[in-house]
């Protein structure tokens, strides 16, 4: 028989239900908790119990408490070597010493499994869930109504934690998507900046080339203008001298006739 998993929730001794169960794996599978709802016909695997002849129509309080316990805290079952074992939650009332022992076991397991005292800790959550289930078991044995009310509180807490976990996972996924988008946008911007810097260098090179061409053209035109001005000045001087010579010749021709 596989030893039952160590839990703060108190269970009865495991009971062999069937020896002809189909072998599902080479080795015994881990403990599995199965939800079983009590029905009027007592459906579902139940450990063999000694049945006494009914002497009254009033339901047996012990049996009713066991059914409520099995509904609140379902039995766990497992298979080993084609044998089906089942283990129900204990219906034995707890004493004050049992509660003190439960507290000591909780503190010991928290220390042994190195649970964190603050923050999110799956180990601490698991142990406190087991402790809460054990408290529900103890309360249910004494008062089924209080046990059912605590069950509603437990289920509400689990639902709230599951909602927060879903919200956290969604937030993490959203943050990852945004981070990837930002990283992609950063890569695009870096690539665009590189392209613009390359384009800027090309434009600066073209500007420098155009400036050099402009300076060369201005220098060439300045030299050409100086040459043209010099040529024009020489022509003017030549024409002035020619004019003076012609004027002198004309005056020399006209003067003897007077």
UniProtKB/Swiss-Prot annotation:
One of its GO terms (biological process) is sperm flagellum assembly. One of its GO terms (molecular function) is dynein heavy chain binding. Residues 176-255 form a coiled coil. One of its GO terms (cellular component) is nucleoplasm. Residues 1-60, 202-231 are annotated as: Disordered. PANTHER family: AXONEMAL DYNEIN LIGHT INTERMEDIATE POLYPEPTIDE 1 (PTHR13183:SF0), AXONEMAL INNER ARM DYNEIN LIGHT CHAIN 28 (PTHR13183). Interacts with CFAP45. Interacts with DYNC1H1. This is Axonemal dynein light intermediate polypeptide 1. It comes from Rattus norvegicus (Rat). The lineage of its organism: Eukaryota, Metazoa, Chordata, Craniata, Vertebrata. The gene is Dnali1.
